[in-house]
Each structure stands twice: as structure tokens, then as C-alpha cells.
């Protein structure tokens, strides 16, 4: 195991040295990220090697690295399944007319009209607020 990890390190180091000079800056950033990930993988591979040495501080059950890596994947898959995509339903205008029973008993359609005198709230109904304040002061 130790020789395999050391071989992986030299391979990564060779990749870094060979690609640093010939790759544009944006690709260099990607390579740095990959090299950092490789370093983390090397550190993780070294941890079980150190824990294999017998000693008073060793645990009876070492944590399995594979099961720890699988758990985030399971959470991501389950969260993807729970996402509900909203559906947009396109409809057209309705041809229905509302019929209300009034005291007069007529079935004719009515238009809702705004009262002409709004009192102190009139200034909010005008298109220009400056005109609303001027007309309020004159009254």
C-alpha cells in the first residue's frame, strides 16, 4: 500500500511539473485544483497506513473510509429525488360572465365604477403626485 501511494505521488508531481509551463492560466487553476484533490487523496490513503501500526492508541474498529465517502453520495441522490419541478399550465381567458342577484332583480351586466370623490385619498389616485398635492392645497 505504501509503495502504491508513493508511486501515485510521483505521478502527480510529474503532471504538475509538465503542465505548469505549457498550459494557459485558466487551465493552470484547474490543474491546481486537481493537484490539491490528489494531495487530499494521498493524505487519506496515508491515514489508514498509520493506523495499522499496533499501539495503545489504536481503535478496535477503524472507520471504513469507503462507507464515509458513500454517505454524502446517498444524501445527494435522495435530495435530488425530493426536488419537485413546478409545472406551468397555460390557459386562455374565460368566457364566463358573473351573474349576481341584486335587489332590483335585473340580469344586466354592471361595470364597477370608482367613486368620483375620494376625499383625502384622492392624491393617490391621480397620475401625477405633484398635481394631487397642488389641488389639495387649493381646497
UniProtKB/Swiss-Prot annotation:
Which residue ranges does the record annotate as region Interaction with ATG16L1? 1-67
Location of the region described as Disordered in the Swiss-Prot/TrEMBL record:
1-83, 97-139
Mitochondrion as a keyword? yes
A Gene Ontology cellular-component term = sperm mitochondrial sheath
PQIIIT, short sequence motif: residues: 86-91
Q: Where is this region: Interaction with VDAC2?
A: 68-139
A biological process from GO: mitophagy
Q: Which domain of life is it from?
A: Eukaryota
InterPro entries, per this entry? DUF4609
Residues recorded with modification Phosphoserine: 94
| Subcellular location, principal | cytoplasm
Pfam families associated with the record: DUF4609
Main role? Plays an important role in sperm motility and male fertility. Required for sperm midpiece flexibility and for the localization of sperm calcineurin to the mitochondria. Promotes mitophagy as well as acts as an autophagy mediator in male germline cells. Links damaged mitochondria to autophagosomes via its binding to the outer mitochondrial membrane protein VDAC2, as well as to key autophagy machinery component ATG16L1.
Q: What is this protein called?
A: Spermatogenesis-associated protein 33
Organism this protein belongs to: Homo sapiens (Human)
